[in-house]
Regions:
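Active-site beta->alpha N-cap acidic-glycine motif
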Residues: 31-117, 123, 127-134, 142-143, ...
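Catalytic domains of cell-wall/extracellular-matrix polysaccharide-remodeling enzymes
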Residues: 68, 114-239
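Terminal accessory/targeting
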Residues: 1-56, 71-81, 195-239
Length: 239
């Protein structure tokens, strides 16, 4: 009888521990901070109380369209942020220097365009630091903003970026210009329901270069000021 009770007690304890373990996994899955969502530490927009908007160009190709993009920015007297892919910069070092010399902001887009949400903490650090080191070697400028390739990030990604002194940047508007080669569509996506603090994702494509003067004209006519991302997010506090 005593043995039976003892067995029942042990069984109940084991079952209780299993329930607690399953509950812990459900409520606090691996890689998710219990102190708050990882996304709370990432910038999806800038200062929403301002009239600032920011074009952010993610660059792993399209070097032939960048001169036209730079000319349009110069024409309107504004500057944008270019998130540079490291392996691209290795082949187009003069283009990187040209972007910088014309007053635009350089930022970090990783080295090999990996899915950084799948990388370890150290793997993320390697991707980010390798790109940052290259841009600094080419221009003497240290990058402080990081946009994850394909918008894919995890807690490891954000921790790695912050450990290296970066702020992680996403976007509030996506023109999807890498896929949809239509200047009118790109223009509409960049300007529809525009709001202060918008971070507008673009890439150097032929159609983006064609649409850009009209986009910048729309900003100006509607009282918005195109500024680099660092200016737009200045003063915006994150967790």
């Amino acid at each position: 009888m005593r043995g039976s009770r003892r067995l029942t007690l042990v069984t109940n304890i084991v079952l209780g521990l299993i329930v607690l373990a399953v509950g812990a996994v459900c409520f606090f899955p691996p890689g998710v901070s219990t102190a708050g969502k990882v996304s709370d530490r990432v910038y999806y927009s800038g200062n929403t109380d301002s009239r600032y908007v920011s074009l952010m160009f993610n660059v792993y190709g399209g070097a032939e369209y960048i001169p036209s993009i730079l000319d349009s920015l110069d024409q309107y007297g504004v500057r944008a942020t270019f998130f540079i892919g490291g392996c691209w910069a290795d082949d187009y070092d003069e283009t990187v220097r040209e972007i910088d010399s014309r007053g635009n902001e350089l930022a970090n887009h990783g080295y090999f365009h990996k899915d950084q949400d799948k990388l370890s903490l150290n793997g993320n650090k390697e991707e980010i630091s390798r790109c940052g080191d290259l841009v600094e070697m080419l221009t003497g400028k240290k990058t402080v903003l990081f946009a994850p390739p394909s918008g894919a990030y995890s807690e490891n990604t954000v921790n790695a970026a912050e450990d290296l002194g970066y702020k992680v940047i996403m976007w509030s508007k996506d023109t999807v210009d890498w896929r949809d080669h239509d200047a009118t569509l790109i223009y509409n996506r960049a300007t529809k329901d525009l709001a202060g603090g918008d971070l507008i994702l673009m890439h150097p494509t032929k159609e983006t270069a064609e649409a850009l003067p009209s986009v910048l004209r729309n900003f100006a006519e509607n009282g918005f000021l195109q500024v680099p991302v660092s200016v737009n997010i200045s003063g915006v506090e994150k967790a």
